[in-house]
């Protein structure tokens, strides 16, 4: 029992480390990008190209890691990597277009709807089923985050189509991260090292055009200052940790868990926005955050309950199996003893 606890402890610590890295880096990158892109900051309104910079630095880190032997490179078919990169890039572009064409309220609803979509897609693709407790906790989280983020909700045809594409592609991308790691027995960082160069190249080629359609500005005409350049470097550095931790979390847990616990970032962003940027914090925001946190706690409890039930089921099957073997051995010994006694009795009678 002590040996099992020793084995579980490092795993639990590394799990918490992956979550902490993702939350801290995600919140940090949003704060850096807010300063970078806002009109009160550097007005660098080229989100898709910036994402290309993010993946370029991530690809460079992966290449250095492979060259120094820090990580091993495993084979993944090129068509799988290209397919994944297409899905991931469509997700990025569609999210940006959705934000541009829809109201902030509808954009937040579309992001929240990713949780049930991921659940349905995992059920269709991997025949995965969820307990009643998990379903309830997911609903509580969605309602809580919805209360504190959704304001005005306006829908138009183009925006609705972009939102649907964004939801589908983002959900599929997160499922693919986990399935590719399992399918090819490849680590999260190794997979990221293979997909990042493809994403970086394609986003840096297509990104300026997408950004022009979104903002009406060309990146080549932007007047780059030293402060803006430093914030781009900061954003890219945080993106490396954000990308690595995303792959780590989905590889260790599931796309649904990543979505649910990931909404802790929304709570952190609202709180930091209130502390650092004088954003308004209303009773509605606070109430929504409390409901969301309660939902996350219920989800953690429900997942632990599922794990315990799986372990108990395996233990029961193991006990049943061992009892059957013991009974067979006892029965066998009993038959042999009876036969020997019969032989002895036969000899006595003679």
Curated annotation (Swiss-Prot):
Pfam families linked: TPT
Signal peptide extent: none
Main subcellular localisation: Golgi
Subcellular location as annotated: Golgi apparatus membrane
Claim: Glycoprotein is one of the keywords in the record: no
TM spans (from-to): 12-32, 41-61, 81-101, 104-124, 133-153, 160-180, 200-220, 224-244, 257-277, 286-306
GO molecular function list: antiporter activity; transmembrane transporter activity
Topology class, membrane: Multi-pass membrane protein
Gene Ontology cellular component terms for the protein in this record: Golgi apparatus; Golgi membrane
Keywords assigned: Antiport, Golgi apparatus, Membrane, Sugar transport, Transmembrane, Transmembrane helix, Transport
Purpose: Nucleotide-sugar transporter that transports UDP-rhamnose or UDP-galactose and UMP in a strict counter-exchange mode.
Family, per entry: Belongs to the TPT transporter family. TPT (TC 2.A.7.9) subfamily.
Protein name: UDP-rhamnose/UDP-galactose transporter 3
Species in which this protein is naturally found: Arabidopsis thaliana
Taxonomic path: Eukaryota, Viridiplantae, Streptophyta, Embryophyta, Tracheophyta
């Amino acid at each position: 029992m002590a040996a099992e606890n020793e084995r579980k402890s490092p795993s639990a610590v590394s799990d918490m480390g992956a979550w902490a890295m993702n939350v801290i880096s995600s919140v940090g990158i949003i704060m850096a990008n807010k300063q970078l892109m806002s009109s009160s900051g550097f007005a660098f309104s080229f989100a898709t190209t910036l994402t290309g910079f993010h993946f370029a630095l991530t690809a460079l880190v992966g290449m250095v890691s492979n060259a120094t032997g820090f990580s091993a490179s495993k084979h993944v078919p090129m068509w799988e990597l290209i397919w994944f990169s297409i899905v991931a890039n469509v997700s990025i572009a569609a999210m940006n277009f959705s934000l541009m064409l829809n109201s902030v309220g509808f954009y937040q609803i579309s992001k929240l709807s990713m949780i049930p979509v991921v659940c349905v897609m995992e059920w269709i693709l991997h025949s995965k089923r969820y307990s009643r407790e998990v379903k309830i906790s997911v609903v509580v989280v969605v309602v809580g985050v919805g209360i504190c983020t959704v304001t005005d909700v306006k829908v138009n045809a183009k925006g609705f189509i972009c939102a649907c594409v964004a939801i589908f592609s983002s959900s599929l991308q997160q499922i693919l991260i986990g399935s590719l790691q399992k399918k090819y027995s490849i680590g999260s960082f190794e997979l990221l090292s293979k997909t990042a160069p493809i994403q970086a190249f394609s986003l840096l080629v297509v990104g300026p055009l997408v950004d022009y359609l979104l903002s009406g500005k060309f990146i080549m005409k932007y007047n780059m200052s030293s402060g803006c350049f430093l914030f781009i470097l900061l954003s890219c550095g945080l993106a490396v940790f954000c990308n690595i931790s995303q792959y780590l979390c989905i590889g260790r847990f599931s796309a649904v868990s990543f979505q649910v616990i990931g909404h802790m970032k929304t709570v952190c962003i609202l709180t930091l926005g209130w502390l650092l940027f004088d954003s308004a914090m209303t009773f509605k925001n606070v109430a929504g955050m409390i409901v969301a946190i309660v939902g996350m706690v219920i989800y953690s409890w429900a997942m632990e309950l599922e794990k315990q039930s799986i372990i108990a089921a395996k233990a029961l099957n193991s006990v049943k199996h061992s009892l059957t073997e013991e009974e067979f051995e006892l029965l066998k010994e009993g038959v042999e003893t009876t036969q020997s006694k019969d032989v002895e009795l036969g000899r006595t009678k003679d």
